[in-house]
Each structure stands twice: as structure tokens, then as C-alpha cells.
Amino acid sequence: MHYPDHLRIITVCLTWQSGFISIDSAPLQKSYMTAMEIWLLERVEPLYRIYPWKALLRAGSRGCSETDYGQNLMRKMMMAYDSEDKEYARLAGFGYRMLAEAIKAELPYHISCPALLICGEKDKAGSAKSYNKKWHQREGLPLKWIKNAGHNSNTDQPDEVNRLIEEFISEADRRGVSG
């Protein structure tokens, strides 16, 4: 077909790569959690409000990371709220309530693109380790365990986590996966 110059259309086609990477996270399907776990997620704020700040600071930093570097990063983030510990409780509580709402919505949250689950072998945050094991088993998603890493495995072992992410992206590029 011939178009007049003023009607010529240039089409640019961009291909977007799609993928899902979960780092020390959990599935949002209600079937993975107990009613008690969801109930507790909805009540983090009042719990954090009555928890002595110094004890919460210690538990938060030690509970999320295995390395000094990871613990110091968590402590530094939390220390931004040192004089506003009630604000920290409010923000954390809000985040956990939103998580509980997403779970209670009972949406399918089906992952239909290439995916990778990453979890620290020493993750002590809630039931993250068991959630990831079940997620891997039920959905068949690849799961990589990070040695000497806790819940913030990307701060405990950043080189290993980055290597896995780069491998995942390279594999998606090689396959030409698009979204």
C-alpha cells in the first residue's frame, strides 16, 4: 500500500521482559496462612506500641539479618524513628494490615510469568521459610536458598542475591520472554 507522506505512520514495537522475583517474601493466598497469623498481622501496631523501643530495635535488627552489615542497616533504618517509636509502630502496623487485607481478599494471585523465589536459609521472620517451601511445592516455582542469610538475604549476601537475579534476567532474555 502507498500512503501519502502526511499519513505515513512509523510503528515502534517495544518488547518488555516480564518476570517475578520474590526475595524473602511470601505468597498472598490465604491457603498458606493460619487464621491466627492473619489475626496477628492485623494487630502489629498495638503490639509494637507496647513493646519497649530498645527491645524492638534489638529484635528487629537481629531478627531480620544474620550479618553485622545487615543488622546495622536494619538498626539504622529503625533508628530514624528513635524519637518517634509510635510512628514506627503506626507505619509497620499499616503495612502489616495492608498485607492482611491482600490475603483476606482471597484473590488468585496467579504468577503466569517466569518466577524465582529467593529466601535466606536462616530466615526467622514469621513463617517466611515455611511459606516459601510450600509456595515452591504447590506452584512449582524455583526456590533458591541463600546460605548464611536471614530475612533480609539481599543485605546479608548481596553478591549471591544479585548473581541469582542477573542469571534470572539473562535466562529470560535468552528465552525472549515478553510480557
Describe each region flagged by the PLM:
Residues 139-179:
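Catalytic active-site module of serine/aspartate enzymes centered on a nucleophile-bearing elbow/loop
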Residues 1-2:
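Glycine-rich nucleophile elbow surrounding the catalytic serine of serine-hydrolase chemistry
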Residues 112-149:
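Conserved loop-alpha-helix segment in the C-terminal half of the alpha/beta-hydrolase fold
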Residues 31, 49-110:
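Conserved alpha/beta-hydrolase catalytic His-Asp/Glu region
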Residues 31-35, 129-131, 156-158:
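Short aromatic-enriched loop/helix-cap "lid" or pocket-rim segments at secondary-structure transitions
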Residues 28, 125, 152:
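Active-site loop signature of alpha/beta-hydrolase-fold enzymes
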Residues 10-48:
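Flexible "cap/lid" loop of the alpha/beta hydrolase fold
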Residues 76-77, 91-98, 130-133, 160-167:
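Alpha-helical elements of Rossmann-like donor-binding domains used by nucleotide-donor carbohydrate transfer enzymes
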